[in-house]
UniProtKB/Swiss-Prot annotation:
Residues spanning the signal sequence: none
Role of this protein: Involved in the transposition of the insertion sequence.
Species whose genome carries this gene: Escherichia coli
Matching SUPFAM superfamilies: Ribonuclease H-like (SSF53098)
GO biological process, one term: transposition
Protein name per Swiss-Prot or TrEMBL: Transposase for insertion sequence element IS3411
PANTHER family reported in the protein's UniProt record: TRANSPOSASE INSF FOR INSERTION SEQUENCE IS3B-RELATED, TRANSPOSASE INSO FOR INSERTION SEQUENCE ELEMENT IS911B-RELATED
GO molecular function: DNA binding
Keywords: DNA recombination, DNA-binding, Transposable element, Transposition
Length: 240
C-alpha cells in the first residue's frame, strides 16, 4: 500500500488518498519516517528485520526445503536464541515454507488367494509378435504423491503395446492397459491371454473387462510368474 500512496500522493494528495482508504494520514507519515530512519523503529521491529535475514540465509543454504522446525533448530545450533513461534510468524510473512514429505504408501497388500499354475516357466522368448506379452506394475514417487504405472510389453520386439498411469492403485486402470494393448495389436481370435495375479491385489475375472467386437471369442485364464525383482508382474501368452 505504501508504494501506491507514494506514487499517487503528488497527484491527489495524502489526505484524500488516506480518506478513501480509511486510514489516518499520521499512519502514512509514521511509516515514511520508519522507512527513512530505521534506527527509530521499535526494538522488536529491528530484531524482526535481522531475524528475517538469518531465516532467509538458512532457508537458501538448505536448498529451500527447510520448514519452520528445521530452520528454528538450525538457528539454535548457530547460537541465535529465538522462539519457534517467532520463526513461524516471520516465515509466514516472508512467504517461506518447507517441502512437505509425502505420507508413507503401502505398496504391497498380501491376500490369501489360490495361485494359478505356471505357463511359461520363465522362458521369456517369443518366435513371433504377440506370442508372449510380459506386463509389469510399478509406482513412482513424485512431489504430488505416488503415481502408479501399468504397462504391457511384447516379448518378441520389446515394444510397449499398452500402458496406463493412475493416481490410485485400482484394478481398473490395469485392465485399461490390457484393453489398450488389445485394441492396438488386435490379436487373432481364439487366442488365449494368460494373466498373472498381482501380488498387490487380487486380479479380477475377465468379465469386468470391456471386450471389443473382435475379442468376443478369447478366453482369459490366470497364471503366476515370479520375477527376479520383488514387484508385481504379469504374463500374457497367445496361442495360435
Amino acid at each position: 500500500m505504501m508504494p501506491l500512496l507514494d506514487k499517487l500522493r503528488e497527484q491527489y494528495g495524502v489526505g484524500p488518498l488516506c480518506s478513501e482508504l480509511h486510514i489516518a494520514p499520521s499512519t502514512y507519515y509514521h511509516c515514511q519516517q520508519q522507512r527513512h530512519h530505521p534506527d527509530k523503529r521499535s526494538a522488536r521491529a529491528q530484531r524482526d528485520d535481522w531475524l528475517k535475514k538469518q531465516i532467509q540465509r538458512v532457508y537458501d543454504e538448505n536448498h529451500k526445503v527447510y520448514g519452520v522446525r528445521k530452520v528454528w533448530r538450525q538457528l539454535l545450533r548457530e547460537g541465535i536464541r529465538v522462539a519457534r513461534c517467532t520463526v513461524a510468524r516471520l516465515m509466514a510473512v516472508m512467504g517461506l515454507a518447507g517441502v512437505l514429505r509425502g505420507k508413507k504408501v503401502r505398496t504391497t497388500i498380501s491376500r490369501k488367494a489360490v495361485a494359478a499354475g505356471h505357463r511359461v516357466n520363465r522362458q521369456f522368448v517369443a518366435e513371433r509378435p504377440d506370442q508372449l506379452w510380459v506386463a509389469d506394475f510399478t509406482y513412482v514417487s513424485t512431489w504430488r504423491g505416488f503415481v502408479y504405472v501399468a504397462f504391457i510389453i511384447d516379448v518378441f520386439a520389446g515394444y510397449i503395446v499398452g500402458w496406463r498411469v493412475s493416481s490410485s492403485m485400482e484394478t481398473t486402470f490395469v485392465l485399461d492397459a490390457l484393453e489398450q494393448a488389445l485394441w492396438t495389436r488386435r490379436p487373432p481370435a481364439r487366442s488365449i491371454t494368460v494373466i498373472k495375479v498381482l501380488s498387490m491385489y487380487r486380479w479380477p475375472t475377465h468379465s469386468g473387462l470391456r471386450k471389443p467386437d473382435y475379442w468376443h471369442q478369447q478366453e482369459v485364464q490366470a497364471t503366476r510368474m515370479t520375477t527376479r525383482w520383488r514387484r508385481a508382474s504379469m504374463v500374457f501368452t497367445k496361442r495360435r
